[in-house]
Curated annotation (Swiss-Prot):
Enzyme type, top EC level: transferase
Binding site for UDP-alpha-D-xylose: 319, 347, 376-378, 480-481, 561, 584-585
Subcellular location per the Swiss-Prot or TrEMBL entry: Golgi apparatus membrane
Comp. bias intervals (Gly residues): 76-103
GO molecular function, one term: metal ion binding
Function, in words: Catalyzes the first step in the biosynthesis of chondroitin sulfate and dermatan sulfate proteoglycans, such as DCN. Transfers D-xylose from UDP-D-xylose to specific serine residues of the core protein. Required for normal maturation of chondrocytes during bone development, normal onset of ossification and normal embryonic and postnatal skeleton development, especially of the long bones.
Protein name: Xylosyltransferase 1
Region Disordered, residue ranges: 42-245, 926-945
UniProt key word Metal-binding: yes
Enzyme Commission number(s) from the entry: 2.4.2.26
Organism for this UniProt entry: Pan troglodytes (Chimpanzee)
Recorded catalytic activity of this chain's protein: UDP-alpha-D-xylose + L-seryl-[protein] = 3-O-(beta-D-xylosyl)-L-seryl-[protein] + UDP + H(+)
Record-annotated membrane-spanning stretches: 18-38
Gene name tied to this protein: XYLT1
Length: 945
């Protein structure tokens, strides 16, 4: 009985000791967690699960302490913490994170030739965290095995714990609170996973996910990352949906669809599917064979040289879009024969190309243009509808006795002659040629998204949920380029059996339906024994470059696209291991030389002295398009280019005492072409109207303007030799590694991208600094360049509008200047295609609010980089921002004249200027001869080429 109090005392002591031990353990855990999280970036690089089985997710963002010469005393501590990148508070943590592979850690020795000043302690080059970007995928950022990555925008992804810098600076209670808040946000769908980055990674100062939750704005997120919540958003319908829309994919689609009609269609489709009224559950198989039939065809290069007694006739269906009319005409010229038939569908958004194709159809009786047009978006159900309607049209043309259906695009080109193709198909006239995926069907279905429901509207493919593959059939698929015989086309078009009817319904709600519909129908039809697993084509797949998810703005999925062929690929066309007759893709604005090589290989060289063989012209604006098709930026600059040409005419052609070569501009530009020579962009060709002051008559002229070289290696050159080129622009094409905005035409509301091209060498980190026209440092960030990186690109999230004028982007290594490039942000003379008003000009041309391109100031870097901000320069910029009319045009033209040169000018018709050359007699004008693309009379052998 006496032991009880002792036992109670021991229990109390044990309880107290246990609480103390738990407290100590908790504190130790928090301390260890704090320090270990500081190096999470390196830990993630050393291992961890990769996203989708590919490369690892992006390392935790980190900053490297850079060796920067110290600022003068006047600059130290100024600029609102600009020199310290946020006013301090990051020093030990940022240094502890260190660098990536090959990236120096801690303090670096000062390099010889560095900027002349003392070392500035604690400065870290900065990439801000206020805006989240998904378009900064640098070179090699896509997993090597892209097929192991989930293609969906919506499927959950796993990622290693990232370092959260704001937590490392808070006490434990605040850390727990922040963690709890982050978890709640992730549960609500605010979290967003970014694809992993490899070489060329931009090194930011803070976690991107943290930036998304604390600073991100809805407009800066990708559409699929916007908050959707747990229930349907407030959506207006003409008629309320017949069910509760609860699926996250459908809710996301409803929140992003722009038109009321599209939202209505999404709701109706989702409900029909939810009620089991949309998709077939079971389909009848009519193929008498078990398994997959695959006929082998013999390939003998010599046997196809002899024309058969009853040669097949081919219906070529050309599905084209864009503005590359000359490339299309060159391809048409190569495939044309009087015995075949050509049915051309032009995307309903490509009116210029449609006008050009109509002119071609008037020249040849065996060429017709579809009287209907669809918007054939990438991956859309409309492409299958286009093929099926084209097949019906062709079968109803009783005067066209064709035997084979072949689909082509303007990016295709033949790699063997028409005679070879006809001889081969005549030998196998009962076969159908389609390329299968070559994988197990379950994997193909998953990667192709066949088990997902899609709907096309508003020129977008919306993912609405999951679905089941119908029972009873084998699903197949592969390439959407094929050769089908007439008998099978008749079956697909006119059959009302269970297979065809239900497959048309199933594939009406399928992503990339043309890549699977014909395969699946053929394999399960009575014609299954006619399938040849070869579509007779070579496609230039480079998944490292082509699988950049570049179509996510069009489809709720991640797809791939083939690359353009280059001259080094020519040997692939000469293989004879299997029958191939066409190749894709070719694009003359990327490389025309390979098209010429192939054309000469098939049909021989043009006669010596033939003009235009190395030139390429592509229209980007035509007067019938209307100026509403132009942006304010392009309209502004096209006008300035025209005035630049008139000044050239006055200075180089005008003689004193007469006005015969002096002009006054009239109206808007009539047309604009891109001009390339030997696969190098040479500038713009502006066709415009002007009044000749000597005779007061209107003349039509064409001006050639060329951009000046703006990339410059530092002088004296640094020891760092990896950088080969740098450029700034918009519309970066990561697949072809070029800017699609040729010439880099930028305005105040554009978001420029900085690109660098690298040679091989050791791993390095470089610093990139963006400077505006009055020497305000707008952005600075580091980029890790691994030894194998070839290109890097990054879009700094600058606050808009950008200040008009000439900007400079400087590249430094160890704070030693390596190179710089410049780009022009043009002030706008038009707003909504009307002359800009004073209040609009002041709003657009005065730079961002408080001169703050980012959350933090970099003012203290100006003296370090020898970039003084001149009060007179700032005052002049302020006056320029308020200018309109002729004063604004004068400011614009002075800027344009500093970045562009008027190379030449010519007259398209009669002119009063006696020394003005005629455009058709020049080598550069869009009116000059172009025999490789010109279509003439049919030759005796039935061909055009």
């Amino acid at each position: 009985m006496q032991a009880a109090p002792c036992a109670r005392r021991l229990a109390r002591r044990s309880h107290s000791a246990l609480l103390a031990a738990l407290t100590v353990l908790l504190l130790q855990t928090l301390v260890v967690w704090n320090f270990s999280s500081l190096d999470s970036g390196a830990g993630e690089r050393r291992g961890g699960a990769a996203v989708g089985g590919g490369e690892q997710p992006p390392p935790a963002p980190r900053r490297e302490r850079r060796d920067l010469p110290a600022e003068p005393a006047a600059a130290r501590g100024g600029g609102g913490g600009g020199g310290g990148c946020g006013g301090g508070g990051r020093g030990p943590q940022a240094r502890a994170r260190g660098g990536g592979p090959g990236e120096p850690r801690g303090q670096q020795p000062a390099s010889r030739g560095a900027l002349p000043a003392r070392a500035l302690d604690g400065y870290f080059s900065h990439r801000p965290k206020e805006k989240v970007r998904t378009d900064s995928n640098n070179e090699n950022s896509v997993p090597k095995d892209f097929e192991n990555v989930d293609n969906s925008n919506f499927a959950p992804r796993t990622q290693k714990q990232k370092h959260q810098p704001e937590l490392a600076k808070k006490p434990p209670s605040r850390q727990k609170e922040l963690l709890k808040r982050k978890l709640e946000q992730q549960e609500k769908g605010k979290g967003h996973t970014f694809p992993g980055k490899g070489p060329g990674e931009v090194l930011p100062p803070g976690d991107r996910a943290a930036a998304n939750s604390s600073h991100g704005k809805d407009v800066s997120r990708p559409p699929h990352a916007r908050k959707t919540g747990g229930s349907s958003p407030e959506t207006k319908y003409d008629q309320p949906p017949k069910c509760d829309i609860s699926g996250k994919e459908a809710i996301s689609a409803l929140s992003r669809a722009k038109s009321k009609h599209c939202r209505q269609e999404i709701g109706e489709t989702y409900c029909r599917h939810k009620l089991g009224l949309l998709m077939p559950e079971k389909v009848t198989r009519f193929c008498p064979l078990e398994g997959k039939a695959n006929k082998n065809v013999q390939w003998d290069e010599d046997s196809v040289e002899y024309m058969p007694a009853n040669p097949v006739r081919i219906a070529f269906v050309l599905v084209v879009h864009g503005r590359a009319s000359r490339q299309l005409q060159r391809m048409f010229k190569a495939i044309y024969h009087k015995d075949h038939f050509y049915y051309i569908h032009v995307d309903k958004r490509s009116n210029y190309l449609h006008r050009q194709v109509l002119q071609v159809s008037r020249q040849y009786s065996n060429v017709r243009v579809t009287p209907w047009r669809m918007a054939t978006i990438w991956g859309g159900a409309s492409l299958l509808s286009t093929y099926l309607q084209s097949m019906r049209d062709l079968l109803e043309m009783t005067d066209w006795p064709w035997d084979f259906f072949i689909n082509l695009s303007a990016a295709d080109y033949p790699i063997r002659t028409n005679d070879q193709l006809v001889a081969f198909l005549s030998r196998y006239r009962d076969m159908n040629f389609l390329k299968s995926h070559g994988r197990d069907n379950a994997r193909f279905i998953r990667k192709q998204g066949l088990d997902r429901l899609f709907l096309e509207c508003d020129a977008h493919m919306w993912r609405l949920g999951d679905r089941r593959i119908p029972e009873g059939i084998a699903v197949d698929g592969g390439s959407d380029w094929f050769l089908l015989n007439r008998r099978f086309v008749e079956y697909v078009t006119f059959s009302t059996d269970d297979l065809v009817t239900k497959m048309k319904q199933f594939y009406s709600y399928t992503l990339l339906p043309a890549e699977s519909f014909f395969h699946t129908v053929l394999e399960n039809s009575p014609h299954c024994d006619t399938m040849v697993d070869n579509n007779l084509r070579i496609t230039n797949w480079n998944r490292k470059l082509g699988c950049k998810c570049q179509y996510k703005h069009i489809v709720d999925w991640c797809g791939c696209s083939p690359n353009d062929f280059k001259p080094q690929d020519f040997h692939r066309f000469q293989q004879t291991a299997r029958p191939t007759f066409f190749a894709r893709k070719f694009e003359a604005v990327v490389n025309q030389e390979i098209i010429g090589q192939l054309d000469y290989y098939l049909y021989g060289n043009y006669p010596a002295g033939t003009p235009g063989l190395r030139s390429y012209w592509e229209n980007v604006y035509d007067e019938p398009d209307g100026i509403h098709s132009l942006s304010d930026v392009t309209l502004t600059l096209y006008h300035s280019f025209a005035r630049l040409g008139l000044r050239r005419a006055e200075t180089s052609l005008h003689t004193d005492g007469e006005n015969s070569c002096r002009y006054y501009p009239m109206g808007h530009p009539a047309s604009v072409h891109l001009y390339f020579l030997a696969d190098r962009f040479q500038g713009f060709l502006i066709k415009h109207h002007a009044t000749n002051l000597a005779v007061s008559k209107l003349e039509t002229l064409e001006t050639w303007v060329m951009p000046k070289k703006v990339f410059k290696i530092a002088s004296p050159p640094s020891d760092f030799g990896r950088l080969q080129f740098s450029e700034v622009g918009t519309d970066w094409d990561a697949k072809e590694r070029l800017f699609r905005n040729f010439g880099g035409l930028l305005g105040p509301m554009d978001e420029p991208v900085g690109m660098q091209k690298w040679g091989k060498g050791p791993n390095v980190t470089v610093t990139v600094i963006w400077v505006d026209p009055v020497n305000v440092i707008a952005a600075t960030y580091d980029i890790l360049i691994e030894s194998t990186a070839e290109f890097t690109h990054y879009k700094p999230p600058l606050n808009l509008p950008l200040r008009p004028g000439v900007w400079t982007v400087k590249i430094l290594h160890h704070w030693v200047p390596v190179a710089e490039t410049k780009f022009l942000v043009a002030p706008l003379t038009f707003s909504n295609r009307q002359p800009i008003k004073p209040e609009e000009a002041l709003k657009l041309h005065n730079g961002p609010l408080r001169n703050a391109y980012m959350e933090q100031s970099f003012q203290s870097l100006n003296p370090v980089l020898s970039l003084p901000i001149s009060p007179a320069q700032v005052e002049q910029a302020r006056r320029n921002a308020a200018s309109t009319g002729t004063a604004l045009e004068g400011w614009l033209d002075s800027l344009v004249g500093g970045m562009w040169t008027a190379m030449d000018i010519c007259a398209t018709g009669p002119t009063a200027c006696p020394v003005m050359q005629t455009c058709s007699q020049t080598a550069w004008s869009s009116f000059s001869p172009d025999p490789k693309s010109e279509l003439g009379a049919v030759k005796p052998d039935g061909r055009l080429r």
